[in-house]
Amino acid sequence: MKRILTISAIVFLAAAVAMPGIANAQDNAWHQKDQVLSAGVGFGMYGLYGSSTLPPIFVAFETGVAEKITLGGLVAYSGSSDDFGYGKWKYTYIVISARGAYHFLEHQPKFDAYAGAGLGYDIVSASVTWNNPGFEAQFGRFYSASASYFFFDVFLGGRYYFSPKWALLGEVGYGVGFARIGVSYKLN
């Protein structure tokens, strides 16, 4: 799966570089003062347990701080559950991440390609609800645990602007899902 996503990302970026460009810098898809809000879904998040899984749903914001550099943040939520006969585990993941990216294509009016990194914090909680009254009497109605950790996010992505403000988003990397798709909207 990771191999397919990596090959897809390389083909996607190679096609964008090969597209004929317009020599006017104003026609770039990304500008220094741009502010972009994105939302979407991730696939293949590390650490998800259970037979029923909600993939990571994310919202991200980024703003230009230099000609090709952006800084921003991302918040994501994911959950899963596992029914094991005498009870049901429920896992919840809340991710908060700071990100930075370098936008490396020029003279592409509809395509924005970038690579970046981030540092995030994953808040993980787990709880169990017992199906067996004997377990409930022995352990209590609920049993819960939590564990949170920092993680490093590395990503390669691109946006295809199908209008001046709206774009389709695709990213591959490690952090909030091995692959992410969504939509982006330029706020300015």
Model regions and ranges:
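Extracellular loop and loop/strand-boundary signature of outer-membrane beta-barrel proteins
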Residues: 44-46, 83-89, 139-144, 167-169
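Short glycine/proline- and aromatic-enriched beta-strand/turn motifs that initiate or cap beta-hairpins
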Residues: 21-63, 103, 175, 182-188
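Short hydrophobic/aromatic segments of transmembrane alpha-helices and their interfaces
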Residues: 6-8, 52-53, 150-151
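Gram-negative (and chloroplast) outer-membrane scaffold detector with strong preference
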Residues: 36, 43, 55-134, 160-162, ...
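Gram-negative outer-membrane beta-barrel domains
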Residues: 62, 102-112, 122-124, 141-188
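Cleavable N-terminal export/targeting peptides
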Residues: 1-33
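Solvent-exposed loop segments that connect transmembrane elements
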Residues: 129-145
